[in-house]
């Protein structure tokens, strides 16, 4: 059976853009915190909430920069998430069930354990249970950004495994947003969204390969979903699933594969503009009135504990169990301590956790601020501990050989089956 070749630079380009974007996101988050607690604070919050557009949705009210970022630009971010998910399942590292097994197991543990920890911590507090999904998310840009600071100390196999787990995690987050955080529905708008989505699927079936019709459909679908009451970012994922994908050996910009072209084009915009803007608009927390004791309030404590304790516990324990039971194999060239470090890094939930927090407590600004405090605290603890573990973890005995083999496959052949073989022991 002939091997399937992939763009030789795609994986490296992805890791490089995510790593650089993660570093920028860290800087922007720190900047937002500084501005929100400086003499510029009033201007910062006023700028975010000044009316800059009409009322597109009765639920949202007049559009503001904050809403344009969270409900429009983030729809583009979710479009990219959807493209990544589809590519991985059709033409990437999740093509076969054998390849999907360990990432799915890890992501399951990484979503269930944080939610259970959150519910346990907040069990005695009323009105907080809807925040159970906040610590279940992983911020791939932040995590890869931390790994970038470690350079070659982190095996390539672990970096690729992290991206795969995060993509599966994103799938779960999308389902949660669609099912758990949708209130009242407007039937006519939802029907219009279904018709638009059906038309986009029909274009795919008819062999339409130009991107313009799909992008137009995405905009129309976004508006219909926004009006319907379902969160508008879901439109991005749904639209992505209709974009055709065609294997394009060695040619990520080939016109034969609209999905590869669109994903390749959106990555820098997402990594260097959309996600940093989201971070700047949402990470700014005024610490006035907060104290160290505020971290012990049920909501921030539950979120921080879910991210810092639940994530590492859920991911590492299920990976360990899967390997010991012979269900899957540990990424080649890595040690158990490095796998633990990766599990800790997955507790960086920044972007997606902040996003879910605002959906969970949309009617309570005070709880949103508490949720932000918990997300930032849990993410910071996870980032610092994950960095230290990976920084001082000794390399595996076969690390150099595995790294050489994996690099050769990625840079020269790009053969997905060969790469996956090298990534497993």
Swiss-Prot record:
The chain crosses the membrane at residues 20-40, 65-85, 102-122, 131-151, 160-180, 183-203, 218-238, 272-292, 303-323, 342-362, 373-393. It is found in: Cell inner membrane. It is a multi-pass membrane protein. GO terms for molecular function: sodium:proton antiporter activity. The keyword Glycoprotein does not apply. GO terms for biological process: regulation of pH. Keywords: Antiport, Cell inner membrane, Cell membrane, Ion transport, Membrane, Sodium, Sodium transport, Transmembrane, Transmembrane helix, Transport. GO terms for cellular component: plasma membrane. The keyword Metal-binding does not apply. Gene3D superfamilies: Na+/H+ antiporter like domain (1.20.1530.10). It holds the Pfam family Na_H_antiport_1. It comes from the Bacteria. It catalyses: Na(+)(in) + 2 H(+)(out) = Na(+)(out) + 2 H(+)(in). Na(+)/H(+) antiporter that extrudes sodium in exchange for external protons. Belongs to the NhaA Na(+)/H(+) (TC 2.A.33) antiporter family. This is Na(+)/H(+) antiporter NhaA 1. It comes from Novosphingobium aromaticivorans (strain ATCC 700278 / DSM 12444 / CCUG 56034 / CIP 105152 / NBRC 16084 / F199). The lineage of its organism: Bacteria, Pseudomonadati, Pseudomonadota, Alphaproteobacteria, Sphingomonadales.
